[in-house]
Amino acid sequence: MQNLENIVAEALQAVEKASDVASLEALRVEYFGKKGHFTLLMQGLRDVPADERPAVGAKINEAKQKAQDALNGKKEQLETEELNAKLASESIDVSLPGRKTELGGLHPVSITIERVVKFFSELGFSVEKGPEIETDYYNFDALNIPAHHPARADHDTFWFDAERLLRTQTSGVQIRTMEKMQPPIRIMAPGRVYRNDYDQTHTPMFHQIELLYVDKKANFTELKGLLHDFLRAFFEEDLQVRFRPSYFPFTEPSAEVDVMGKNGKWLEVLGCGMVHPNVLRNVGIDPDEYTGFAVGMGVERLTMLRYNVTDLRSFFENDLRFLKQFK
């Protein structure tokens, strides 16, 4: 037991002299590790006579606990001293400005959607929505694009099976609305659409807004006036606007609308036309009694023109250096 007393005395003395947590950890390994002094003493119990073993074991545990308590106390003391020293070395200049809270902003595509919706809402158009997973009927057939129609090849459609697809246009919302509502109808349908295309001016997912107006006296003159007012309000300029004859299966007559750019060139912004009589018949509306016009615009296209963005893909890369410009 004389050896035990010496080990305890040496341990307590070494702990008291320890100047940092690292040296204290080295002492812990020396006395309590796998080959530490107290570990070897416990292993030596097997050589002690059986009748003396409990008493000897109790003394070793008592000595071990004494050394452990000293080690724990010294560790707590050293950690407190280190923390106080660190706090004393760090100072806060209360005259410095505080850290600013970064505020987010709307995505440029969302800004455009809000502007378009606000303009047409003030003219009595309501927002209607439909499913992004659409059926062949609502995406094509009901819009006067039957299975054999060559216009289907232009859509680069994502198909799930023979009947279900990711919608290539929000026009299906027009069909669903006309099925459940009676004229007069005045709606807009903003939403995501999908086409299998990816380059500087195309992405597999993009946004469209379509307008539909159906009434007994809807005509192309109204359509032209509406779009003139919208484009000048959206771009906040007295733009020169032109309508070019075009072709869409679901409108007749059809037109594409251009605005004069600052470089003196015409820039295409949207498509429009009078709703085709076949489309009205497909939803049970008599084309001899009612007429209508429809407008389709690409949100990213409008946003690119308004903010002079040259690469459509910039809208979807989440680059804060780009997005912060629109706050």
UniProtKB/Swiss-Prot annotation:
Assigned keywords, A-Z: Aminoacyl-tRNA synthetase, ATP-binding, Cytoplasm, Ligase, Magnesium, Metal-binding, Nucleotide-binding, Protein biosynthesis
KW Ligase (keyword) present: yes
Cofactor descriptive note: Binds 2 magnesium ions per tetramer.
Required cofactor names: Mg(2+)
Reactions that this protein is recorded to catalyse: tRNA(Phe) + L-phenylalanine + ATP = L-phenylalanyl-tRNA(Phe) + AMP + diphosphate + H(+)
GO biological process: phenylalanyl-tRNA aminoacylation
Residues holding Mg(2+): 252
InterPro entries named in the record: aa-tRNA-synth_II, aa-tRNA-synth_II/BPL/LPL, Phe-tRNA-synth_IIc_asu, Phe-tRNA_ligase_II_N, Phe_tRNA_ligase_alpha1_bac, Phenylalanyl-tRNA_Synthase, tRNA-bd_arm
Enzyme class: ligase
Enzyme Commission identifier(s): 6.1.1.20
CC annotations in GO: cytoplasm
Domain of life: Bacteria
Gene Ontology molecular function, alphabetical: ATP binding; magnesium ion binding; phenylalanine-tRNA ligase activity; tRNA binding
Family annotation (Gene3D superfamilies): Bira Bifunctional Protein, Domain 2
Subunit and partners: Tetramer of two alpha and two beta subunits.
Family that this chain belongs to: Belongs to the class-II aminoacyl-tRNA synthetase family. Phe-tRNA synthetase alpha subunit type 1 subfamily.
Name this protein carries in UniProt: Phenylalanine--tRNA ligase alpha subunit
Lineage, highest ranks first: Bacteria, Pseudomonadati, Pseudomonadota, Gammaproteobacteria, Pasteurellales
